[in-house]
Amino acid sequence: MGLLCSRNRRYNDADAEENAQAAEIERRIELETKAEKHIQKLLLLGAGESGKSTIFKQIKLLFQTGFDEAELKSYLPVIHANVFQTIKLLHDGSKELAQNDVDSSKYVISDENKDIGEKLSEIGSKLDYPYLTTELAKEIETLWEDAAIQETYARGNELQVPGCAHYFMENLQRLSDANYVPTKEDVLYARVRTTGVVEIQFSPVGENKRSGEVYRLFDVGGQRNERRKWIHLFEGVSAVIFCAAISEYDQTLFEDENKNRMTETKELFEWILKQPCFEKTSFMLFLNKFDIFEKKILKVPLNVCEWFKDYQPVSTGKQEIEHAYEFVKKKFEELYFQSTAPERVDRVFKVYRTTALDQKLIKKTFKLVDESLRRRNLFEAGLL
C-alpha cells in the first residue's frame, strides 16, 4: 500500500511538473507573440545595384553594435575579389573599345603593361581569387594608372564597372598589407550580391527609449531571379523602403545589357505598388546615389533615358542638378499615384534624397522614417 501511494505521488509530481512546463511554454509563446506585435517589419526592396544592401549595412553600424573584428575580417576575400573583378572589367573593356570605338587608339594599353593586363585578366576570370599580395597590388596599380585604363574607366557606365572601383583602386597598398583588416568604410564599399533574405532588428532612437519603435528590416535579393522569393515576406509588413539608384539612368542591367536600369526600376516600383498585400502598406522611396547623380547630370543628359526623354535642361551647375532631381522625383510621384487605387492614396508615401555611403544622412533619414511611421500608428489608434 505504501509502495502504491509512493508511486502515485511520483506520477502526480511528474504530471504537475509537465503541466508547469506546458504552462511556461504557453506563457513564453504568448509573451513572444505580444513582443512581435510591437516590432514593425520593413521590407527593403530595389533593383540590383540600387544601393539597398549598403543602406542595410549602415543600419547595422548606426543602430546596432556594428561589425566586430571577425565580421570585418570576413569581408577581406570579398574586397579582394572586388579588386580583381574590377581590374579585369577595365582591362577587357579597354580591349573591346580599342577594337570597336571610332577613337580606338586612346584605349590601347601601353606595350609595357600588356602582359600585366593579360595576367590580371586571367586571375579575374577564376572562381577562386588569390590573396591580394603587395606584388599583385603594385601590378594592379600600374595597370590602373595606364592612360588607356583611365579612359576606359571614364566610360565605366557602359561596362558594368562597380561603384567601388575608384575607392579600392586608390587604396591598393593598404588592402594588400599582410596585417590588413577591413575598416567599416571598406565594408560599406564592398560589393557582394544579395541572394535570399537577410534581416536585422533595430530602433532609430535606441532600444531603451520608450518613444522609439522597434523595427525588423529585411533585405531581399534585388536581381530579377530573386524577386519571386519575396512573396512570403509581404504579409503584415508596416512599410516598404524602395531604393532607386537615380544615377543609373544611362546604365544597363547586370543581368540584361539591353535593359536600361532606370526603366527596370520604374517597372519594379510599379509592380510592387500594385501588389494586393501592400494595399495598406506605407511606402518610403529612397532616391539613392545622389552623390553620383549630381556629378553625372552635368556630363550625361537625363533624357538619354527613355522614361526621361521629355526632360529639358533649364540651367547649369547647381541649379541644373536641383532641376533634374526634382524632375526625377516628380516622375516617381506620378508613377506612385497612377499605380495606386483611389481608395488607397491616403497611405503614407514619403520621398527621401539619399546617398547610401553618407552615414549622417542615412541616420537622419531613418529618424524621419521612424517619425512618419509613429505618427501613422498614433493616427490609426485615434490619438492624433
From Swiss-Prot:
Mg(2+) binds at residues 53, 194. Signal peptide: none annotated. SMART domains: G_alpha. Pfam families: G-alpha. The keyword Cell wall biogenesis/degradation does not apply. InterPro entries: Gprotein_alpha_su, GproteinA_insert, P-loop_NTPase, Plant_Gprotein_alpha. Residues 38-384 form the G-alpha domain. Belongs to the G-alpha family. This is Guanine nucleotide-binding protein alpha-1 subunit. It comes from Lupinus luteus (European yellow lupine). The gene is GPA1.
